[in-house]
Amino acid sequence: MSGIDPKRFGKVAVLFGGESAEREVSLTSGRLVLQGLRDAGVDAHPFDPAERPLSALKDEGFVRAFNALHGGYGENGQIQGALDFYGIRYTGSGVLGSALGLDKFRTKLVWQQTGVPTPPFETVMRGDDLAARATDIVAKLGLPLFVKPASEGSSVAVLKVKTADALPAALAEAATHDKIVIVEKSIEGGGEYTACIAGDLDLPLIKIVPAGEFYDYHAKYVADDTQYLIPCGLPAEQEAELKRIARRAFAVLGCTDWGRADFMLDAAGNAYFLEVNTAPGMTDHSLPPKAARAVGIGYSELVVKVLSLTLND
């Protein structure tokens, strides 16, 4: 596909592991990315920032990094800033796009100001009177609701709440993961979709049909009964328009090159964007490899394409 001489990439670090709640997912992603790059002839090496100082990247002559870290400092702009400081090119978004992309609260604020549709929501701060806030939120948003920490990925600590009585406990659980908790109106009727973005590749939308209540951590990385529908079943014109909106939702946050934008459709077919992911999972359960495979792009070819985006000015 790319016709790129792998020697152009130089010495490449595959960053994976880290110290976030998503460490295990990152370890799986990183090992597969490493193998995919090596299969293509890239001089790629494993690098876990939880075990080695980042300064070793410069000391050991790395010129490029494939970021397979998920959550925490790997996705919130910190690693990106350090790599900028060391002059090492890296996959995915820069400091601003990464920081905003991991912060669901500020993502939604930007979307509200730029016309990207997103579900109505309220925020709860750690230390708030949870019972009082729960009563107020149910009155404003109704039920069911989704409760999620503002800055965790992979659906860590995301809970669906169907009754008012269950909301305070869900808020308390989410607040153990983040000082800001998002409470979002559940969009029902049309299903959940993701748009995978990888440079100029035209990847199909994926409709996600979990066997359980929603697409949680277990459905993403453990269960084998989640259905991923490609093609997604939408009319071609609607799919093209949703992909256009997804790219805009990604771009207005300052996100670049590669990632995902997740959204729900209501019963009338209206889209509501939930979040972006600037360092998507690359496990055998993950969505970008599935979307690429559907259009004839294998795993190794996909990771080389993503890495090739670091060659652009």
Swiss-Prot record:
GO molecular function, one term: metal ion binding
Keyword flag Cell division: no
Matches recorded under Pfam families: Dala_Dala_lig_C, Dala_Dala_lig_N
InterPro entries (UniProt xref): ATP-grasp, ATP_grasp_subdomain_1, D-Ala_lig_Van_CS, D_ala_D_ala, Dala_Dala_lig_C, Dala_Dala_lig_N, PreATP-grasp_dom_sf
Cofactor note: Binds 2 magnesium or manganese ions per subunit.
Record: residues binding Mg(2+) 2: E275, N277
Pathway: Cell wall biogenesis; peptidoglycan biosynthesis
Keyword entries, A-Z: ATP-binding, Cell shape, Cell wall biogenesis/degradation, Cytoplasm, Ligase, Magnesium, Manganese, Metal-binding, Nucleotide-binding, Peptidoglycan synthesis
Cellular component, GO, one term: cytosol
Domain of life assignment: Bacteria
Reaction equations catalysed: 2 D-alanine + ATP = D-alanyl-D-alanine + ADP + phosphate + H(+)
SUPFAM superfamilies: Glutathione synthetase ATP-binding domain-like, PreATP-grasp domain
EC number: 6.3.2.4
Domain ATP-grasp as annotated: residue spans: 108-308
GO biological process entries: cell wall organization; peptidoglycan biosynthetic process; regulation of cell shape
Cell compartment(s), UniProt: Cytoplasm
Cofactor: Mg(2+); Mn(2+)
Annotated positions binding Mg(2+) 1: D262, E275
Biological role stated in the UniProt entry: Cell wall formation.
Family designation: Belongs to the D-alanine--D-alanine ligase family.
HAMAP family referenced in this protein's UniProt entry, alphabetically: Dala_Dala_lig
NCBIfam families: D_ala_D_alaTIGR, PRK01372.1
The protein, known as: D-alanine--D-alanine ligase
The gene coding this protein: ddl
